[in-house]
């Protein structure tokens, strides 16, 4: 759900900022340059003042690649799990898409252990990871029957990642990733008119859903008839576009019979799942 602050900002036309590398996310702050209020990393579970201060201290540093930044962050003691959560929040978007950076972080972890790069690598491990031996041969000083010696990890990482340069993340995936980290949604954007995020679901009778409307931040209770739901089942965390809906009278069981009430409720009759 949106916080009171988010609703206030939206009502008065104050733009919500975002969690972004090089921005001040140490606490809620007015960002005059971008005309918005930036959120605080401290509002995210497991993020401390120390982490927020570290990230902000790097705002003016230049990094040729995300690998260089990863090296700094790991040497400063930032846990890989926190880095992964920041990636999911699109915090490091200047370096590439979420999926690309997730893959790069995985590859980086193969070569960076205990705050330093490996200098040799077992051939068995290269084979298990499915990496072309020629990549290692181009980036090592020598090799034995079992190991590649004096390796150039950054060169190897760079070559491996060429295969993933076009790895994109859809807008709907970005929204889902954000929810995974925050545990709620704070997105309000009119370009998402008709798009909803399933926040709750009870399919015991006629399926009841709670939908978060991405265009305005409202949470809407709706129902779907069993046949429609069976043809296109949904679960919590799904994103749908509502194509058709209808307002029908609520029903209540009285003396063993279903009676229509004056109060009405929304039923979704057609939707597209993303």
Ranges and model annotations:
Residues 1-274:
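Noncatalytic, beta-rich nucleic-acid-contacting surfaces in large DNA/RNA-processing enzymes
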């Amino acid at each position: 759900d949106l916080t009171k602050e988010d609703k206030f900002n939206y009502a008065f036309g104050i733009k919500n900022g975002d969690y972004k590398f090089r921005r001040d996310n140490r606490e809620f702050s007015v960002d005059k340059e971008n005309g918005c209020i930036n959120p605080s990393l401290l509002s995210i579970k497991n993020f401390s003042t120390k982490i927020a201060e570290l990230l902000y201290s790097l705002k003016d540093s230049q990094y040729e690649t995300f690998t260089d930044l990863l090296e700094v962050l790991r040497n400063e003691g930032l846990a890989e799990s926190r880095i992964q959560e920041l990636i999911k929040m699109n915090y490091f978007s200047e370096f590439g898409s979420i999926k690309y950076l997730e893959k790069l972080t995985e590859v980086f972890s193969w070569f960076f252990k205990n705050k330093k790069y490996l200098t040799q690598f077992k051939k068995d491990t290269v084979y298990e990871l499915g990496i072309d031996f020629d990549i290692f041969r181009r980036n090592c000083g020598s090799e034995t029957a079992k190991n590649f010696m004096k390796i150039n990890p950054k060169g190897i990482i760079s070559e491996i990642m060429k295969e993933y340069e076009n790895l994109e993340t859809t807008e709907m995936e970005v929204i889902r990733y954000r929810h995974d980290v925050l545990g709620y949604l704070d997105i309000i954007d009119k370009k998402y008119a008709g798009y909803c995020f399933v926040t709750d679901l009870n399919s015991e009778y006629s399926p009841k859903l709670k939908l978060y409307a991405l265009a305005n931040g409202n949470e809407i209770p709706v129902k779907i008839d069993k046949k429609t739901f069976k043809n296109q089942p949904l679960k919590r965390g799904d994103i749908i576009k509502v194509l058709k809906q209808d307002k029908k009278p609520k029903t209540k069981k009285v003396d063993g019979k279903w009676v229509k009430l004056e109060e009405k409720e929304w039923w979704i009759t057609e939707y597209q799942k993303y």
